[in-house]
């Protein structure tokens, strides 16, 4: 159903990404107790923390872009997950984009990642730590076959399934977005232990990484959570609908004007940028 829409969505995302956003002018976190504000795709954060760039279990990619900030809950999740992976001898976790120092809208690449509760993690676990040059210009491993319906068998491994499962089993995680072909492979690999699959949601792109989203933290009273995923493992008709051809007469998505910022985020911009 959705294969032909992927390129269109990518074009829309890039078209809306040409203009810089005022959030990029904020170079340091806003002081105060940690507060995620607004929705994942329209919000900001006060009291963000920088993910430590030196760690045993993970490495941070593209540090020159300074997208390694998030709510303390997100920093702690990354540390928990990478410690689990390291203790199991699975390899090094590769951390991609989190958020900017005050969150807010990016000028490209993401619609969400605005409240300090989202992180992209590569779906590869190198046994040898990457060099500085590799981290600055990372080579993503496209796990999805050219037909868009299956993973590439030679690139898939049980460790990738285990990495996603470990993340999904974390109580703070509400959703993990992966390509539909990757979700399908997880459904095949899961066996009888399937409860965690409910959190793994098929979505456009996401061929080489998973996008992990946490719940709104306790105390972040202006944070807007999503409704829980539908009951079940998500491996049935819903998943298969992603592989169906588009219906006759279907039209490409229309680029939407971003909604107004939450008042607290607008006030933050007014004070620190505008």
Swiss-Prot record:
Recorded GO MF terms: metal ion binding; metalloendopeptidase activity; serine-type endopeptidase activity
Biased composition (Pro residues): 245-263
GO cellular component, one term: outer membrane-bounded periplasmic space
Enzyme nomenclature, EC number: 3.4.24.-
A biological-process GO annotation: peptidoglycan metabolic process
Cofactor or coenzyme needed: Zn(2+)
Signal peptide per UniProt: 1-19
Binding site for Zn(2+) 1: 110, 113, 120, 211
Family annotation (InterPro entries): Hedgehog_sig/DD-Pept_Zn-bd_sf, Peptidase_M74
Region (Disordered): 224-263
Entry keyword annotation includes Membrane: no
Major location (coarse): periplasm
Domain of life: Bacteria
Disulfide bonds: 44-265, 187-235, 216-223
Class of this enzyme: hydrolase
Family: Belongs to the peptidase M74 family.
Name of the protein described by the UniProt record: Penicillin-insensitive murein endopeptidase
Species the sequence originates in: Klebsiella pneumoniae (strain 342)
């Amino acid at each position: 159903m959705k294969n032909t829409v992927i390129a269109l969505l990518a074009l829309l995302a890039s078209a809306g990404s040409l203009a810089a956003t005022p959030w990029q002018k904020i170079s340091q976190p806003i002081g105060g107790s940690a507060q995620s504000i607004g929705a994942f795709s329209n919000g900001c954060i006060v009291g963000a923390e920088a993910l430590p760039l030196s760690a045993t279990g993970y490495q941070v990619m593209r540090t020159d872009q300074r997208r390694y900030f998030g709510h303390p809950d997100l920093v702690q999740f990354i540390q928990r997950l990478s410690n689990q992976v390291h203790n199991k001898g699975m390899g090094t976790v590769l951390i991609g984009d989190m958020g900017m120092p005050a969150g807010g809208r990016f000028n490209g690449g993401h619609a969400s990642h605005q409240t300090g509760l989202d992180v992209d993690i590569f779906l590869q676990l190198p046994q040898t730590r990457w060099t500085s040059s590799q981290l600055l210009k990372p080579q993503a491993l496209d796990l999805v076959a050219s037909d868009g319906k299956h993973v590439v068998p030679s690139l898939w491994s049980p460790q990738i399934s285990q990495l996603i499962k470990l993340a999904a089993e974390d109580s703070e995680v509400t959703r993990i977005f992966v390509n539909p072909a990757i979700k399908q492979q997880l459904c095949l690999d899961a066996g009888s232990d399937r409860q965690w699959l409910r959190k793994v949601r098929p979505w456009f792109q996401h061929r080489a990484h998973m996008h992990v989203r946490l719940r709104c933290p306790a105390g972040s009273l202006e944070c807007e959570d999503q409704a829980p995923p539908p009951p079940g493992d998500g491996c049935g008709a819903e998943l298969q609908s992603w592989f169906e051809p588009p219906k006759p007469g279907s039209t490409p998505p229309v680029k939407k004007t971003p909604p107004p910022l939450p008042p607290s985020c607008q006030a933050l911009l007014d004070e620190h940028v505008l």
